């Protein structure tokens, strides 16, 4: 798993990119939360933290533009799920969102990454798992609500769930950038992904 330093470790030039683009990068530590407000663990309120508390703190302490049109959210792996989860459910807060190698459908992986601590065991809590996966949140948005970029490596174990998300977005006629490139669930892949996401968000901010 990653932590608050992961992006800078993957992309040491991130501070220079921030200066060049005039972008503030805020990197919270999501632990193993999947960025949910956990129905099983009341101590885990990461959706509230990221979409409300952290946004208010950042706007109150840094020279931000406090508007959804100047705010984007992205992440890798669990964070890719978290970014889309947060933006789709809080499109009043974020104007753009991205996922790199995101676990956008958690249900094929019921024994992985301590998700059962947040949602309960899959077999006994299928409805909760269905309700807490990104691919089942798309009814909350229509085309134009969010600028979306989604990418995943062709050797990544999350590739198929990302293709499914892409097809569901197409079926709903929701515009999005969808990229697959050679690579796996690795830092080398994400180092390049960050470049694409920053470019995408920079163009969004300048609209």
Predicted regions and their residues:
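Non-catalytic cap/lid and distal C-terminal segments of serine-dependent acyl enzymes
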Residues: 1-207
């Amino acid at each position: 798993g990653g932590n608050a330093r992961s992006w800078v470790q993957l992309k040491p030039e991130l501070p220079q990119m921030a200066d060049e683009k005039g972008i503030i990068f805020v990197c919270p530590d999501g632990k193993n939360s999947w960025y949910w407000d956990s129905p099983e663990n009341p101590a885990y309120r990461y959706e509230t933290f990221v979409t409300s508390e952290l946004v208010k703190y950042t706007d109150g302490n840094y020279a931000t533009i406090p508007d959804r049109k100047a705010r984007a959210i992205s992440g890798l792996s669990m964070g890719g799920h978290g970014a889309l989860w947060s933006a789709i459910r809080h499109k009043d807060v974020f104007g753009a969102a991205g996922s790199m190698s995101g676990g956008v459908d958690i249900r094929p992986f019921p024994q992985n990454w301590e998700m059962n601590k947040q949602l309960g065991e899959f077999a006994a809590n299928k409805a909760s798992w269905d309700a807490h996966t990104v691919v089942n949140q798309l009814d909350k948005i229509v085309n134009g609500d969010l600028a979306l970029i989604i990418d995943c490596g062709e050797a990544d174990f999350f590739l198929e769930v990302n293709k499914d998300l892409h097809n569901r977005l197409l079926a709903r006629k929701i515009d999005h950038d969808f990229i697959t490139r050679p690579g796996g669930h690795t830092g080398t892949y994400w180092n390049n992904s960050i470049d694409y996401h920053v470019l995408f968000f920079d163009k969004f901010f300048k609209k």
